[in-house]
């Protein structure tokens, strides 16, 4: 088993819970305020993690200008994506549509991996990309 497998499992569980809680919140809070609460809480959680690293002498947090730039772009995408999910749920979008939506993002990442990060293409990856895109179109019904 690869060294990152359990991190992937934890991330999948947490992001699954993230969408369930977003669905529950969407009918009880506006998308802007809800998105802000989500992202502020996320920032606070990361701050607690950084404090833990500092206090336990495990600090190994380096950065470059490019790293900060791409992190800012990531934050913009996460913030806008959170608002988009709030709006999706507020307008009656089903929670069951989220896996296909995320698969569309996965297809985008796989294409970027092949085109920009020189990850080897395989028939399995190409099929996964195609199925993810098909899944997005099936959501229209």
Each model region followed by its residue ranges:
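Membrane-interface interhelical linkers
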Residues: 1-13, 22, 27-32, 37-72, ...
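Alpha-helix boundary/capping detector
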Residues: 50-52, 102, 114-115
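Hydrophobic transmembrane alpha-helices of multi-pass small-molecule transport proteins
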Residues: 124-140
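Alpha-helical structural signal
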Residues: 10-11, 85, 105, 113, ...
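Hydrophobic/small/kink-forming positions within alpha-helical transmembrane segments
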Residues: 12, 16, 20, 47, ...
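C-terminal transmembrane-helix exit sites in multi-pass transporters
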Residues: 106-123
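Residue-level "edge-of-site" marker
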Residues: 39, 101, 129
């Amino acid at each position: 088993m690869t060294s990152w497998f359990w991190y992937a499992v934890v991330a999948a569980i947490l992001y699954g819970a993230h969408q369930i809680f977003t669905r529950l919140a969407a009918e009880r809070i506006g998308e802007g305020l809800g998105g802000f609460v989500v992202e502020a809480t996320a920032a606070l959680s990361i701050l607690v993690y950084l404090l833990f690293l500092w206090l336990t002498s495990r600090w190994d947090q380096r950065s470059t200008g490019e790293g900060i730039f791409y992190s800012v772009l990531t934050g913009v995408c996460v913030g806008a994506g959170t608002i988009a999910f709030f709006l999706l749920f507020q307008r009656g979008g089903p929670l069951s549509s989220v896996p296909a939506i995320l698969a569309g993002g996965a297809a985008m990442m796989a294409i970027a991996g092949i085109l920009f990060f020189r990850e080897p293409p395989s028939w399995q990856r190409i099929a996964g990309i195609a199925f993810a895109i098909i899944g997005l179109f099936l959501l229209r019904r």
